[in-house]
């Protein structure tokens, strides 16, 4: 028995609880065993007992446990332990990260979690959902400019047009602003409007939705000019008049000539949360500014007449003193403020792990139903054991060996049951890190041909991880959770749950069995997607690939 000083939060968190230690690298049978910590009365120290473990030189050399009390030598083989269940831990031919891994063993006595699980960079990720993407203005700044009748530049994603539009509130347009739009834009001036206003003005779609062959299915209506106060309809003054007439709640169908020089667009209800386009972004910004739901938008062109891309847009914005914002930031801004789910039903549900209360939540955005399994009483909502699990049909239902999803789900439910209090939120629509079941199976074929899980998605032209956790955060808030011990290996999930009035007070790692089928997958998640598998030397065992991708299947 050796005495150590639990100055590290990792040791303090594990005091009095058995843990499993696995030496990094090629794991040998001799490396498996257990380490028990127990507090010393009237002392800040704890005793540590090694059982069934061949002590490695790196234990002492690397200082895996703080303090100088450890005295074992490099070749010591401590007594075998019968309490270790081999099927719960990596096998002899497994390959793990080079860092040491500490895995808490859960008992009915309670649950402790690792505190220093992610780097400061990971902890800061998306904590403030109002913080703009680097190089962009904040959405709140753009809203203020919209309120003042100013133009802003809105940029969409590279997977769409990757272009910038000049946008302003239609109700505040002036001939001078319109002249600026015509000068630096394509000349095709659009006004995005809600469906009820288009119906009120009898402005039908140019083509039926199912016949729309435009690349992004932009919903153009018939074009118009205002009858009163215009001449040809093409001048900046005439176009401003038409826009003002469209934005007026008092306008009538007979106030317009058809066709004309202004292109009304149909806004999709739900805005950027439903469709991440400029049409939806412009109306969302107008409404967030407290103005009528109509906005002017026009694509910005470069000096040679080509579409201006982001580098040129930044130069243009600085020269003209315009704010530039991204639709991605607007989506995050709205996700923080809009109610995304509604509780639809609740029932007692007996599971193989024990009885829980099952809560069904329906997304108000897409109608997808999600479920939360609640064990015990949430009470004050502090320190609740939580798992936010992404749907994986192949792993969760059919036990696919390609991933560790089913194992993580079962382990999380077992931990919650033993702790006697906790929540598992099961998010549907997250299949294959958001790419869907069909694409996931296509990615599997590419993995069989030699790609890893990241490369396969990229070869299919799909994002490495497109999941959002705002719905999960809102479900937790509705259930009364305020602070949580999060069961995850994924830094992106840590960041994705911050910013919704929730705090994360610790992490519980989920280290599942490694097999010949999922070994490369798990290693790719570590090296390219930033996953953390336990704690070493008081620091997170964490690497982020050069592409910065982060995710958990």
From Swiss-Prot:
Binding positions (Mg(2+) 1): 161
- Name the cofactor(s) required for activity, per the record: Mg(2+); Mn(2+); Zn(2+)
Which segments carry the region annotation Disordered? Answer: 70-90
Reaction(s) catalyzed by this protein? Answer: D-ribulose 5-phosphate = (2S)-2-hydroxy-3-oxobutyl phosphate + formate + H(+); GTP + 4 H2O = 2,5-diamino-6-hydroxy-4-(5-phosphoribosylamino)-pyrimidine + formate + 2 phosphate + 3 H(+)
Q: Which Gene3D superfamilies match?
A: DHBP synthase, GTP cyclohydrolase II
Q: Where is this region: DHBP synthase?
A: 62-336
Which biological pathway? Cofactor biosynthesis; riboflavin biosynthesis; 2-hydroxy-3-oxobutyl phosphate from D-ribulose 5-phosphate: step 1/1; Cofactor biosynthesis; riboflavin biosynthesis; 5-amino-6-(D-ribitylamino)uracil from GTP: step 1/4
**The UniProt record lists the keyword Cell membrane:** no
Keyword tRNA processing among record annotations: no
From the Swiss-Prot or TrEMBL record, state where the protein is found. Plastid, Chloroplast
> Cofactor: bound how, per the entry note?
Binds 2 divalent metal cations per subunit. Magnesium or manganese.
Quote the catalytic residue positions. 465, 467
> Where is this chain compositionally biased, Polar residues type?
72-85
Residues engaged in binding GTP: 387-391, 408, 431-433, 453, 488, 493
Which Gene Ontology molecular-function terms are recorded? 3,4-dihydroxy-2-butanone-4-phosphate synthase activity; GTP binding; GTP cyclohydrolase II activity; metal ion binding
Q: Which residues are tagged with the site Essential for DHBP synthase activity?
A: 261, 299
> What is this protein's function?
Involved in riboflavin biosynthesis. Catalyzes both the conversion of D-ribulose 5-phosphate to formate and 3,4-dihydroxy-2-butanone 4-phosphate and the conversion of GTP to 2,5-diamino-6-ribosylamino-4(3H)-pyrimidinone 5'-phosphate (DARP), formate and pyrophosphate.
Q: Which HAMAP family match?
A: RibA (MF_00179), RibB (MF_00180), RibBA (MF_01283)
The record's comment on protein family reads: In the N-terminal section; belongs to the DHBP synthase family.
Q: What is this protein called?
A: Probable bifunctional riboflavin biosynthesis protein RIBA 2, chloroplastic
Report the source organism: Oryza sativa subsp. japonica
């Amino acid at each position: 028995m050796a005495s150590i000083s639990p100055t590290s939060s990792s040791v303090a968190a594990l005091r009095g609880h058995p843990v499993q230690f696995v030496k990094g690298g090629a794991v040998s049978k001799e490396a498996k065993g257990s380490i028990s910590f127990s507090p010393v009365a009237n002392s800040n120290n704890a005793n540590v007992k090694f059982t069934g473990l061949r002590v490695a030189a790196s234990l002492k050399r690397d200082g895996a446990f703080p303090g100088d009390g450890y005295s074992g030598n490099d070749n010591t083989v401590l007594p075998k332990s019968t309490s270790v269940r081999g099927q719960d831990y990596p096998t002899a031919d497994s390959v793990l990260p080079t860092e040491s891994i500490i895995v808490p063993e859960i008992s009915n006595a309670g649950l402790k979690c690792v505190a220093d699980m992610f780097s400061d960079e990971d902890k800061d990720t998306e904590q403030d959902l109002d913080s703009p993407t680097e190089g962009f203005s904040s959405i709140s700044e753009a809203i203020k400019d919209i309120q003042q009748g100013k133009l802003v530049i809105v940029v969409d994603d590279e997977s769409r047009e990757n272009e910038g539009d000049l946008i302003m509130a239609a109700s505040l347009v002036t001939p001078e602003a319109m002249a600026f739009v015509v000068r630096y834009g394509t000349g095709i001036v659009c006004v995005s409007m809600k469906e009820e206003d288009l119906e009120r003005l009898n402005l039908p779609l140019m083509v039926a939705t199912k016949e729309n062959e435009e690349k992004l299915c932009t919903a153009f209506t018939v074009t118009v000019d205002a009858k009163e106060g215009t001449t040809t309809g093409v001048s900046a003054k005439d176009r401003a008049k038409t826009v003002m007439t469209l934005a007026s709640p008092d306008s009538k169908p007979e106030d317009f000539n058809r066709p004309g020089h202004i292109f009304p667009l149909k806004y999709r209800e739900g805005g950027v949360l439903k469709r991440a386009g400029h049409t939806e972004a412009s109306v969302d910004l107008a409404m967030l500014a407290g103005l009528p739901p109509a906005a002017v938008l026009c694509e910005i062109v470069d000096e040679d007449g080509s579409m201006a891309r982001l580098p040129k847009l930044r130069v243009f914005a600085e020269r003209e003193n315009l704010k530039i914002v991204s639709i991605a930031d607007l989506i995050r801004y709205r996700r923080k403020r809009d109610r995304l789910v509604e509780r639809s039903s609740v029932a007692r549900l007996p599971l193989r792990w024990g009885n829980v209360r099952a809560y069904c939540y329906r997304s108000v955005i897409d109608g997808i139903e999600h479920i939360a399994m609640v064990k015990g009483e949430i009470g004050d909502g502090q320190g609740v054991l939580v798992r936010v699990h992404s749907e994986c049909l192949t792993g969760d239902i059919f036990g696919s060996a390609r991933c560790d999803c089913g194992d993580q789900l079962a382990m999380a439910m077992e931990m919650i049951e033993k702790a006697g209090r906790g929540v598992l939120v099961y998010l549907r629509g997250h299949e294959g890190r958001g790419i869907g079941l069909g694409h996931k199976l296509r990615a599997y074929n590419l993995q069989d041909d030699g790609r890893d899980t990241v490369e396969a998605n990229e070869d299919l032209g799909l994002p490495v991880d497109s999941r959002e956790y705002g719905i999960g955060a809102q479900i937790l808030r509705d259930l009364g959770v305020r602070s949580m011990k999060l069961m995850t290996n994924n830094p992106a999930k840590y960041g994705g749950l911050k910013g919704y009035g929730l705090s994360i007070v610790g992490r519980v790692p989920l280290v599942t069995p490694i097999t010949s089928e999922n070994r490369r997958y798990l290693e790719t998640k570590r090296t390219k997607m930033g996953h953390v598998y336990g704690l070493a030397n008081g620091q997170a065992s964490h690497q982020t690939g050069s592409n910065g991708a982060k995710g958990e299947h």
